UniProtKB/Swiss-Prot annotation:
Cofactor(s) the record lists: Zn(2+)
Catalytic activity as recorded in UniProt: 5-(methylsulfanyl)-D-ribulose 1-phosphate = 5-methylsulfanyl-2,3-dioxopentyl phosphate + H2O
Co-factor: note: Binds 1 zinc ion per subunit.
Protein name, as recorded: Probable methylthioribulose-1-phosphate dehydratase
Length: 240
């Protein structure tokens, strides 16, 4: 007599689509970005917004090992006015993994993710600690600039001949202290979908997780390209 298999159906990031929950998307993208060095050493993170709810991974744990029931779920409290953008006091918890026996803190990136939602209408945000992003902040001062590179087309509203500009803000000792300068950059650069943080990494977003993923892959390619062109004596901000 044959036994019926009770194995759980397994999928990975290559099969993600709109039928998957935000928790499933975050878990799979974390695994993918860990292999690319974007969220190693417990750093970096991903957040998504869907149907009025905000999904955020916990802080200080290995991102490639995050499980679906470890994702915080928040929503905006309409009765609370935003006074301090660092505290996110206008958000209330819908689900906490600590209700299931965990002892986690929500990602320290929460105020930065929330700014991308509030100021830019993002649907998903990726925070990367990729080496290429960090190095790019060392070869540019206040703005990362590239032009005449084919991959620029992958950023919404940009083309091959355009100058793609990404603002660079100064790093701080604690993530939430970036809120003020990030808000200023979001308002000053309406055409960007990324903000670099000096000697740290980058925040990248899109209208949903699909566009955020596309933007993240394109920006990281351009960061790496600019660094390598610099090593070869070329200027990525020039068409020459």
């Amino acid at each position: 007599m044959s036994q019926q298999s009770t194995a759980v159906k397994v999928f990975d990031h290559t099969q993600l689509n709109d039928t998957h929950t935000p928790q499933q998307v975050i878990v799979e993208l974390m695994k993918l970005y860990y292999t690319q060095g974007w969220v190693s050493g417990t750093g970096g993170g991903i957040s998504m917004k869907k149907d009025g709810k905000i999904y955020i991974a916990p802080s200080g744990i290995h991102k490639e090992r995050i499980k679906e029931d470890q994702i915080f779920v928040m929503e905006q409290d309409p009765e609370v006015q935003v006074v301090d953008i660092q505290s996110c006091q206008h958000l209330k918890t819908v689900y906490s993994p600590n209700d299931n026996g965990y002892n986690f803190k929500i990602s320290a990136c929460q105020p930065l993710f929330q700014l991308c939602y509030d100021v830019r209408g993002a649907g998903a945000v990726i925070h990367s600690h990729a080496l290429s992003a960090m190095l790019a902040t060392l070869i540019y001062d206040k703005e990362f600039k590239v032009t005449h590179l084919e991959m620029i087309k992958g950023i919404r509203g940009h083309g091959f001949y355009d100058e793609l500009v990404v603002p660079i803000i100064e790093n701080t000792a604690f993530e939430n202290e970036l809120a003020g300068s990030l808000k200023e950059a979001l308002e000053k650069y309406p055409n960007t979908f990324a903000v670099l943080v000096k000697r740290h990494g980058v925040y990248i977003w899109g209208k949903d997780w699909v566009e955020a993923k596309t933007h993240a892959e394109v920006y990281h390619y351009l960061f790496d390209c600019a660094v390598r062109m610099k090593q070869l004596g070329f200027d990525a901000s020039s068409k020459q």
